[in-house]
Amino acid sequence: MAELKLYPVGIQTFEEIITRNLLYVDKTEYVYRMTHSGGKHFFLSRPRRFGKSLLVSTFKSYFQGKKELFKGLAIEKLENEWTEYPVLHFSMAGGKHMEKDQLERYLGSRLAEQEKVWGITSPAVDANDRLISLIQTAYEKTGKQVVVLIDEYDAPLLDVVHSDVNLPVLRNVMRNFYSPLKDCEPMLRFVFLTGITKFSQLSIFSELNNITNISMDDEYAGICGITREELETQMSVNVDVLAEKMDKSREQMLESLREFYDGYHFAAQSPDIFNPYSLLNAMAKSKLDYYWFSSGTPTYLIEMLKKFQVMPSEIGSCEADQSEFDAPTEGMSSVMPLMYQSGYITIKGYDPETELYTLDIPNKEIRVGLYRSLLPNYIGMNTVKGTTTIAKMSALIRRNDMDGAMQMLQAYLATIPYCNNADSEGHYQQMMYVIFSILDNYVDVEVRTPSGRVDMVLRTATHLYLFELKLNKDADAAMKQINLKEYPKRFALSGLPIVKVGVNFDVATHNITDWKIEHE
């Protein structure tokens, strides 16, 4: 059996991973490809915790000429020169949750670290002048062009992307910092910036007009994350060990990992890509869990969903032109660019004839995690009790006990305070949609039939449920509509037993008053 290496969970430094003999999925062929493409300025957008920082660190070691670190990797057979260049490496990851003055001091500290390395004792005042001085000094002292690596360039802006007041202020600070990258072009060998989102009005996009955005290029689709091929080859022994610990066959283990963490695609022709953070955590802890979602609350995303009044049921499958989602996030007219660039929806298909992309939630981890985050909007802030209730409902529904599940939900709703917008049928429809999505079942709303729309369809492994929801009426009225409009006929070929569920909600109590269940 091949050597089982320890997992580099939370370690983003290439040199440390190699020297400690930790697991490294070889991405060095991409490093060679990019550095020998003839281009000079590159930008890559990927979701958080997707390997961007490790990739930047890999470029750093490569440009520092540390050939010994790349022994046995793809680039060892490709690169012949191993020329050492001066490298300026900046990470903006620590620049979050800051006001203008704090951000300016943060940038000053990052510049001071580099100035100390290059012996600059009397720096200029403004950040852009200091960056120019750094590039000039490194160029003059070494006689070689300078490499500039900027990781998480947009980190200071993510928290204010929804703010019309703070975003322009902080964006101007960052524009000032990045502006020398154009003027210093003759002194630069390679510039690489990574981030989550695309901000058009930063100088790196509006002034540095020759930057190459590789974020949706087919040839770089697998540059971050772990492809299915890499999982089954470079991590084959890890899959076998995890399968043994979880008492599954190799095929069952691969399918479970795929269901939880696979499903990302970043180009029209993209391999299947797994979330690396969750995959490594699952293997290190021998447990499938919601690691990526638990590592950061997407508060800015939740704020944007509210701003654009996006219903939970609208987050799923849709078709879009590339310009609708691979677009700048400031001034956006929909939440789609932020959803895509942040990793909450991804490419699921591409039609070359229409040039339309199909977008959807990548996998179970994101689907369940996202709807859990939205749950407090519908059932109050007691998420612990809410999660417990939903877990018990899940067990009941698996046993086809919808009556018991409705009793459980009714009892819980009686304990929560008033929720905003709870006086419309749509509120309760979306609440039910969120709950059933968390249960990891197929669920859809406003499903068309020849005679009307079914409020909600729920499909489990064993049954198909058709829900009709009423407000301030009764369950009999809901059931009467299902039968009168013959909704079940639309689903006769589903191959599953059909169960009709009529539910009535009361505006005054914000709860279920009654329900009726009939088997077709």
Indicate where each model-derived feature is located.
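Structural motif
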Residues: V147, H463-Y465, V499
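Metal-dependent nuclease catalytic cores in nucleic-acid-processing enzymes
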Residues: F177-C184, P337-I345, Y433-S437, Q481-V501
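Mg2+/Mn2+-dependent nuclease catalytic core
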Residues: P168-N172, L471-P488
